[in-house]
């Protein structure tokens, strides 16, 4: 796991999370959960936000929203089981924060289709999911939603796996836009 970090600010804030498309498993523990618990207990962060990204999960599970809904509670319980402490970390459900959707909408006016098409992670996931030319708009634009999540919480640290690196770097670039600077 690699930590994608923005410039140092007054408050040190972590934003991380998971899509509730099933139970978390050993791969999640080794890949991110163990590190989250370590960061939570490090004392280096003023605020820690752990998002259950149900809205993002719908971008490629729109045909089965019940699967997503049923796993929200399970993911929260899995967080508690591995040692995420609600006294130290804020666990929240993405769809319960409507401002994230609103901010995503504004950001969609700043990012071009060609920029999204060039994102190597998005390209790989489109191929992996066999979307071909029938790419759902929500799926195609979810990197914009992720940028909104990051900026809304003013996250300084976004723990991300190597597969997220191109997207995290793109978010960092997007966050330097005049719109972001005005909205801070």
Label each region the model flagged.
Residues 87-101, 120-129:
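Short, glycine/charge-rich beta-strand/loop segments that flank catalytic centers
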């Amino acid at each position: 796991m690699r930590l994608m970090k923005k410039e140092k600010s007054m408050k040190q804030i972590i934003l991380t999370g998971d899509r509730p498309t099933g139970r978390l498993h050993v791969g999640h523990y080794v890949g991110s959960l163990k590190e989250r618990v370590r960061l939570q207990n490090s004392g280096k962060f003023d605020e820690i936000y752990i998002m259950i990204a149900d809205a993002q999960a719908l971008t490629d599970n729109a045909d089965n929203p019940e699967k997503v809904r049923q796993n929200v509670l399970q993911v929260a319980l899995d967080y508690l089981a591995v040692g995420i402490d609600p006294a130290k970390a804020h666990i929240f459900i993405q769809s319960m924060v409507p401002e994230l959707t609103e901010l995503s909408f504004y950001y969609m006016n700043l990012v071009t289709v060609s920029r999204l098409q060039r994102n190597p992670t998005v390209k790989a996931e489109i191929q992996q999911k066999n979307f071909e030319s029938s790419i759902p708009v929500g799926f195609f634009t979810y990197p914009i939603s992720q940028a909104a999540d990051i900026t809304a919480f003013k996250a300084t640290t976004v723990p991300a796996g190597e597969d997220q690196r191109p997207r995290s770097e793109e978010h960092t670039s997007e966050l330097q836009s005049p719109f972001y600077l005005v909205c801070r």
